[in-house]
Amino acid sequence: MAKDDVIEIDGNVVEALPNATFKVELDNKHIILCHIAGKMRMHYIKIMPGDRVKVELTPYSLDKGRITYRYK
């Protein structure tokens, strides 16, 4: 996947699910399923419900995403 095809959008984590999967409510009120990006897993960055995160979506599947950044 080319990096320019990615859609980046902010949201809030609503619920933590098994296997490092989260329900994220985007700023436009859509709720999507997201998993943690590999670099965040590698550096043991913890994500809790209520955290503000940056999510990457592909144009092919707008209901699943990848969490790439947790705001402080």
Curated annotation (Swiss-Prot):
A Pfam short name: eIF-1a
Subcellular location: Cytoplasm
Keyword Kinase tagged: no
GO CC aspect terms: cytosol
CDD domains named among the record's database cross-references: S1_IF1 (cd04451)
Keywords on record: Cytoplasm, Initiation factor, Protein biosynthesis, RNA-binding, rRNA-binding
Domain S1-like intervals: 1-72
Domain of life: Bacteria
PROSITE patterns named in the record: S1_IF1_TYPE
GO molecular function: ribosome binding; rRNA binding; translation initiation factor activity
Function as written in the Swiss-Prot or TrEMBL entry: One of the essential components for the initiation of protein synthesis. Stabilizes the binding of IF-2 and IF-3 on the 30S subunit to which N-formylmethionyl-tRNA(fMet) subsequently binds. Helps modulate mRNA selection, yielding the 30S pre-initiation complex (PIC). Upon addition of the 50S ribosomal subunit IF-1, IF-2 and IF-3 are released leaving the mature 70S translation initiation complex.
Recorded family membership: Belongs to the IF-1 family.
Subunit-structure text: Component of the 30S ribosomal translation pre-initiation complex which assembles on the 30S ribosome in the order IF-2 and IF-3, IF-1 and N-formylmethionyl-tRNA(fMet); mRNA recruitment can occur at any time during PIC assembly.
Name assigned to this protein: Translation initiation factor IF-1
Source species: Campylobacter fetus subsp. fetus (strain 82-40)
Organismal lineage: Bacteria, Pseudomonadati, Campylobacterota, Epsilonproteobacteria, Campylobacterales
This protein's encoding gene: infA
